[in-house]
Amino acid sequence: MLQTAALILAAGKGTRMHSDKPKVLQTVLGEPMLRYVLEAVRPVFDGRVLVVVGHQAGMVEAAFPDASFVHQEQQLGTGHALMQAMPALEGQCERVLVVNGDTPLLSEDVVRHFVEASEGADLAFATIELDDPAAYGRVVRAADGSVRAIVEAKDYDPALYGPEPHEVNAGMYCVRLDLAARLLPRIGNANKSGEYYITDLISLAVAEGCKVQGVQCGRDESLMGVNSPLELSRSEEFLRERVVDGLLRSGVMLHAPALVRISPLATVEPGAEITG
């Protein structure tokens, strides 16, 4: 298995949150979102984890003094974030997993499955199915099912790509470092956001004949990002239900489970009794 490191993208401001606090420090069940992502990736990569910070970087660094950071002084997109991290990654790994820091439902099992499923690919990305794709990047496939590209929602033109698909980019990638080093300089920012998208690596890799794999994860909510207070609230409820279900299955007595709010990082022994 190729030596792999993880890169967590945590530089964005999160404008739609309408808060001065960095988006990854918004809390879910009392813990900042970034903590859940770190907890999911650290066991898989034996500490080979970097966090890209930008907006209010000092606040994020202070909240996680045990993490290693790369600075993205200008927030020019996900592709630009990977560019800034390349000097720190080169010589340390053969491929890199890139994941968004605003996915508080992410689990170690999902990360491990994705890394193992993408082992034979030059570049892989996770996809999920959504009834309403909203602002997610659309996965464009050829007639034979092979991946053609990921097109950001605001740039999607049905005249060019066909009817909008329900399969969307889940924001988790695994790419060979030598391929990233070769293709990143060719990414442009001629799009409506004026940003450098990491998703552009996919169409470039396809054009080069590289093995590009879209790892389908069904409707798994664990990969859903948080971009607004509404999505934050929904993620918290998903996580609360997951915690409650786990406690009940482990032998914890909950008398009013609908009222229980416990951090998934808390330890509750079997036989404990919680009244709400």
Where are these regions (language model features)?
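Conserved beta-strand segments of alpha/beta enzyme cores
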Residues: 24, 48, 68, 146, ...
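Left-handed beta-helix
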Residues: 193-276
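Short glycine-enriched, charge-decorated loop/helix-capping segments at active-site entrances
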Residues: 21-27, 69-71, 187-190
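N-terminal nucleotide-binding beta1-loop-alpha1 segment
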Residues: 1-19
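Active-site glycine-centered loops adjacent to acidic/histidine catalytic or metal-binding residues
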Residues: 12, 102, 129
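Conserved core of the sugar-phosphate nucleotidyltransferase
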Residues: 65, 106-192, 199
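Conserved N-terminal catalytic core of the sugar/cofactor nucleotidyltransferase
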Residues: 1-5, 31-116
